[in-house]
Amino acid sequence: MVKLFIGNLPREATEQEIRSLFEQYGKVLECDIIKNYGFVHIEDKTAAEDAIRNLHHYKLHGVNINVEASKNKSKASTKLHVGNISPTCTNQELRAKFEEYGPVIECDIVKDYAFVHMERAEDAVEAIRGLDNTEFQGKRMHVQLSTSRLRTAPGMGDQSGCYRCGKEGHWSKECPVDRTGRVADFTEQYNEQYGAVRTPYTMGYGESMYYNDAYGALDYYKRYRVRSYEAVAAAAAASAYNYAEQTMSHLPQVQSTGVTSHLNSTSVDPYDRHLLQNSGAAATSAAMAAAAATSSSYYGRDRSPLRRAAAVLPTVGEGYGYGPESELSQASAAARNSLYDMARYEREQYVDRARYSAF
């Protein structure tokens, strides 16, 4: 049986018309039309050759048709799967065994099985009949038609499709493309990969031009390196200073006259306590000014009568004293009462609180 391909068929053509046209040269087994092409199966090979010779470019309904042998003839029937092969068997020995039934195109052994490609389908059928379930090198091998279509290894498929490059016309073992997808020219690959040889390091360690190029440009890990304590402290101080400036920038700059003069004074301790002037105790304050110049600027606030009776204090240092009879004098008592009755501090609390809250 020979399968013929008919191309460029007109739309008016029918299967009966095509069948009757080819039956002039031999028995037609099957006729199929698919869109603008079709297939005709002729029983005799000689009749098929006559049909090709006479009907090629034949004008049918005003259109020249193409008649030729089908190129997509199934060659899967020529590929045989041979199982249970002896591990000592070689490709040459297996090929010679199958060549007893016809020409062998390719023979590939994969582990304990193999694929054998016969040139003709009838030879493949004869090989199956003669070699299936027969002894070969001490093992009973099984021969059958291969049904695999995916070419995942050499020998799995026909010559029309290479499993490496996907092109037709050659087997995988004859493919010029290597397994990496490049043309198998090892000299060219070697020159491309290893042709540029760098000069050796003739300088000392750390003085080579290659060393400087690699490690002397930028330090991408500088931010992750451990810094000294002094550097960390300086960075923290600068950050705190900047934060204080940003925080104080939005606060009001208004201050009272008393507070401004008190802060601007460089000779007076800002935390020193001074008695403020009061009209009700002007005479007493004048009397205490001379005593305050020779004594401490702070006033003792020991209000416990027990400790006050036992303590030995200066006579006029703190605004009160003891007489010859060790009794509290009336003048000292009056001065002491007037001192604690007046308002000692008259500062603006909001301005002071805003001044110290930033720190």
From Swiss-Prot:
Cross-link type Glycyl lysine isopeptide (Lys-Gly) (interchain with G-Cter in SUMO2), residue numbers: 79
UniProt zinc finger (CCHC-type) residues: 160-177
Domain of life: Eukaryota
Residues where Phosphoserine is found: 86, 304
PROSITE patterns reported in the protein's UniProt record: RRM, ZF_CCHC
SUPFAM superfamilies attached to this UniProt entry: RNA-binding domain, RBD (SSF54928)
Maturation and modification: Phosphorylated. Phosphorylated in vitro on Ser-304 by SRPK1. Phosphorylation on Ser-304 is induced upon cell stress signaling, which alters its subcellular localization and may modulate its activity on IRES-mediated mRNA translation. Phosphorylation on Ser-304 is induced upon cell muscle differentiation.
UniProt-annotated stretches for the region Interaction with TNPO3: 196-359
Main location per the UniProt record: nucleus
The RRM domain, residue ranges: 2-72, 78-148
GO BP term (any one): mRNA processing
InterPro entries: Euk_RNA-bind_prot (IPR050502), Nucleotide-bd_a/b_plait_sf (IPR012677), RBD_domain_sf (IPR035979), RBM4_RRM1 (IPR034897), RBM4_RRM2 (IPR034898), RRM_dom (IPR000504), Znf_CCHC (IPR001878)
MF annotations from Gene Ontology: miRNA binding; mRNA 3'-UTR binding; mRNA binding; pre-mRNA binding; pre-mRNA intronic binding; pre-mRNA intronic pyrimidine-rich binding; RNA binding; zinc ion binding
GO cellular component assignments: cytoplasm; cytoplasmic stress granule; nuclear speck; nucleolus; nucleoplasm; nucleus
Presence of keyword Secreted: no
Function: RNA-binding factor involved in multiple aspects of cellular processes like alternative splicing of pre-mRNA and translation regulation. Modulates alternative 5'-splice site and exon selection. Acts as a muscle cell differentiation-promoting factor. Activates exon skipping of the PTB pre-mRNA during muscle cell differentiation. Antagonizes the activity of the splicing factor PTBP1 to modulate muscle cell-specific exon selection of alpha tropomyosin. Binds to intronic pyrimidine-rich sequence of the TPM1 and MAPT pre-mRNAs.
Quaternary structure annotation from Swiss-Prot or TrEMBL: Interacts with TNPO3; the interaction mediates nuclear import of the protein and is disrupted by nuclear Ran bound to GTP. Interacts with EIF4G1 and WT1. Interacts with EIF4A1; the interaction is modulated under stress-induced conditions. Interacts with AGO1. Interacts with AGO2; the interaction occurs under both cell proliferation and differentiation conditions and in an RNA- and phosphorylation-independent manner. Interacts with DDX5; the interaction occurs in an RNA-independent manner.
Name recorded for this polypeptide: RNA-binding protein 4
Species the sequence originates in: Oryctolagus cuniculus
